[in-house]
UniProtKB/Swiss-Prot annotation:
Protein name: 3-methyl-2-oxobutanoate hydroxymethyltransferase
Residues the entry annotates as binding 3-methyl-2-oxobutanoate: 49-50, 88, 118
Taxonomy of the source species: Bacteria, Pseudomonadati, Pseudomonadota, Alphaproteobacteria, Hyphomicrobiales
Function recorded in the entry: Catalyzes the reversible reaction in which hydroxymethyl group from 5,10-methylenetetrahydrofolate is transferred onto alpha-ketoisovalerate to form ketopantoate.
Family membership noted in the UniProt record: Belongs to the PanB family.
Residues the record marks as active site: 187 (proton acceptor)
Source organism (scientific name): Bartonella henselae (strain ATCC 49882 / DSM 28221 / CCUG 30454 / Houston 1) (Rochalimaea henselae)
Cofactor comment text: Binds 1 Mg(2+) ion per subunit.
A GO term from the CC aspect: cytoplasm
Coiled coil: none
Residues binding Mg(2+), per UniProt: 49, 88, 120
CDD domains assigned to the protein according to its UniProt record, in alphabetical order: KPHMT-like
Amino acid sequence: MTIHKAVKRITASEIRSRKGQEPIVSLTAYQAYSARIADPYCDLLLVGDSVGMVVHGFETTLPVSLDMMILHGQAVMRGSKRALVVVDMPFGSYEESPEQAFSNASRILAETGCSAVKLEGGVYIAETIDFLCKRGIPVMSHVGLTPQAVNRFGGFKTQGRNESNWQQIEADAAAIEKAGAFAVVVEGVVEPLAVKLTQMLSIPTIGIGASSQCDGQILVMEDMLGYGTWVPKFVRRYGVLEQEMEKAIKSYADDVKSRTFPSDEEIYKLKQKSG
């Protein structure tokens, strides 16, 4: 009898213990197939509300619903075995009260099987993070450029360009650490501030457009694979998959029009009559 050894999934506490150790490798994932490919190489897969912009074509993350996040969270859990899967709580699903946040976060964990959620914000959301953590829901937070606050920021703008603005971001990071978050995404802040946050916090910082000195890095998978024409400054492209996809689709279209697809080897034929 063949015995299959179960793969142990990384936990939130294990991610927290990686502070100052080997950098944490993270990517976004929205589908089972991409999660399956990324899983052996990533410590953490984030089912980000960026799915609204990347997959569904929204201009911001604001229209993303809780049901959408659960659907994509289920897909990523089915595709992965090893990485810690964290699901974003979408705009409007946690800001009203800690009780609202717990109701929706517990639904995410129960219906997807994931092990943690991510909330944007700092000081103002610390009470909610504390409420969730004390009730058994691991929380990763997100400071700096927080996409759900796009209207308040007036767009997707780098934070901390003036040192006079650092104090609020530092206060946000300290508040979510005290509240019990196991890690924090630091997005779109100037490099010296990202380094300072990494040094002052006892929990891992996971950078995106921040600093190589963060405790880990995360990118939108489609960005680093080479989909789309606009490339943010902080993205390094490791592939050109959009061009490859277009090339393949064009070849398919040409073959269909020329009737060279399907070929004899790609169609089913009648069985030969015996006798």
